[in-house]
């Protein structure tokens, strides 16, 4: 095969130009409409943290999608914001821990009452995953909770307390109905 260096160079330059190009993206975060310019390869995590100042979104695994600390809720489902391109979020409804903290959701109280956070690094990802679960199933079994939390890592090994807090929040949700 004959390699054409000029063609190779042109493709590389075109690809590089595409990643530098900025796109207008509009989405709703914690009930507020946001308009941002993003690069094609920019993760949602970086946009939320750096452009919008929402620092509950963490990065424990270096953007590998392996820890759950960057979890947000998008259109009702938990997603890893480190592996979701911001350009793909146009029109989305996004919830972060900052939005949950301002609500009267039972998870906020049960997480505090159970001393769920030790170092606190994983807490936003866990609590948003739990909220998405409880929004769809307010009476989850322990196995349901474990399955939902399967993508979240707690460096302190505090898993049993997360489960207890989620069960108690589910009970409070069921009592409200």
Segments the model singles out, each with a brief description of its role:
Residues 2-177:
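Signature of N-terminal electron-transfer/Fe-S-associated modules in redox systems
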């Amino acid at each position: 095969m004959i390699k054409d260096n000029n063609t190779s160079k042109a493709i590389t330059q075109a690809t590089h130009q595409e990643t530098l190009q900025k796109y207008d993206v509009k989405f709703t975060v914690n009930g507020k409409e946001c308009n941002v310019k993003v690069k094609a390869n920019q993760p949602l995590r970086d946009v939320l943290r750096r452009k919008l100042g929402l620092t509950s979104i963490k990065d424990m695994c270096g953007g590998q999608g392996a820890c759950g600390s960057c979890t947000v809720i998008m259109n009702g489902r938990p997603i890893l914001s480190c592996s979701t391109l911001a350009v793909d979020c146009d029109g989305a409804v996004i919830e972060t821990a900052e939005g949950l903290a301002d609500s009267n959701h039972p998870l906020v109280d049960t997480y505090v009452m159970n001393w769920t956070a030790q170092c606190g690094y994983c807490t936003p990802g866990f609590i948003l995953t739990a909220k998405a679960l409880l929004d769809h199933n307010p009476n989850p079994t322990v196995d349901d909770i474990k399955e939902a939390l399967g993508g979240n890592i707690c460096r302190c090994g505090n898993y049993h307390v997360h489960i207890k807090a989620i069960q108690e929040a589910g009970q409070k949700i069921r009592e409200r109905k």
